Amino acid sequence: MVHADGHNFPGSDPNPHMNKFAFGCAIVASIISIIFGYDTGVMSGAQIFIRDDLKINDTQIEVLAGILNLCALVGSLTAGKTSDVIGRRYTIALSAVIFLVGSVLMGYGPNYPVLMVGRCIAGVGVGFALMIAPVYSAEISSASHRGFLTSLPELCISLGILLGYVSNYCFGKLTLKLGWRLMLGIAAFPSLILAFGITRMPESPRWLVMQGRLEEAKKIMVLVSNTEEEAEERFRDILTAAEVDVTEIKEVGGGVKKKNHGKSVWRELVIKPRPAVRLILIAAVGIHFFEHATGIEAVVLYSPRIFKKAGVVSKDKLLLATVGVGLTKAFFIIIATFLLDKVGRRKLLLTSTGGMVFALTSLAVSLTMVQRFGRLAWALSLSIVSTYAFVAFFSIGLGPITWVYSSEIFPLRLRAQGASIGVAVNRIMNATVSMSFLSMTKAITTGGVFFVFAGIAVAAWWFFFFMLPETKGLPLEEMEKLFGGGGPRGDRDGLEIQTKTISIGGFS
């Protein structure tokens, strides 16, 4: 497959200034990701206290940790359909309500079954959040700033994880029965903040075009663009991608007809995709698979146990070392957000994955040495440094790029459902790792598990090298061409020419 080298593509946005309104919308949408990150991170420490309070075993802990992701599978597949029917904005609002209910139940948590129900409901919210936040951010962004804005949800996930770790450390000093319940229940507050913020967010202009609501889409496009000329160009590109028959437009507010070939989205996406769509789907599924198959969830969720295996024994020191993981993750994702639109997705991704291979191998070696020879000062230090290095390399590339890349490569008509498939694979792998890690460490040792992760990271590097072209600076409407497609039909070029020659009321 021929790879793009990251140069400016025709139609890319040359304007270096980020639109403040689009930035604000992306920030509000990303609050939902903070809640998800918090629910993920807080469980790493909360499980220590839950186990003591509710007298549960390792298997029940694995199920409690992993059920969030199994239920997220349901949420992500549902969100794909929901976001196409009621819109991106109201799907975000729905996910906030789901998180609110789940957080209240977990905070109440009088016993294990109620805790599981709350965790399951929160998991459905996770599926909604992971699918909708990057898609919404991508659809309101210009090409030149899409990497930055679309990486904000991943940054907010990391901030949420960090807040979860800090919550573990602070509330862990309270009584056993109260501490972990406050850790879990406090996640309800960001849901309320999002519920207020959603009232000030506009709908995605691309979704509005798909609904034939061009007048509304046009007004929002002006708000999220720096100039009317930029808004006009982006609006015309969306009309082309959405296959709107512009010859039937008398006035923008007068209604339009979308061209419909009778093909369902799922048939075009999965059952009988064109070659370009097939490559896009493989790329999206592959990057989501490898994001969690390389072991990041094991470190995020079980870092206190990993550090304990390495020789850290004090509960306070375990939780502090875990806070260090959260700080490292957040810091390097912040760096990544500024590099994505400058360096490009591909270079960062390959560098990130290569670094992960070395960090995982180093961690596996150090943990194996501790397993065989007992506490060794150098092995303890190496294991902690390797853990932080793995998190750093993951966070500067594979972590944020997974969501940026998979949310931008699908054609508009397939984006919501395509993104939901990627999230579903992501959650399956996340659940697989989180629900099997403790069992695997008993079977092949903790060091052995990280040797496996290192091998998977090698396979990931080769997959990314051959299957993922550069997308930096390319408009969303041009992605299908990047993967070798010419658009929905052979007359796409004619449709583009036709669109550019017709004045859309209000822009000219």
Swiss-Prot record:
Gene3D superfamilies: MFS general substrate transporter like domains (1.20.1250.20)
Signal keyword on record: no
Domain of life according to the entry: Eukaryota
PROSITE patterns: MFS, SUGAR_TRANSPORT_1, SUGAR_TRANSPORT_2
Family matches, as Pfam families: Sugar_tr
GO cellular component: membrane
Function: Plasma membrane sugar-proton symporter.
Protein name, UniProt field: Probable polyol transporter 3
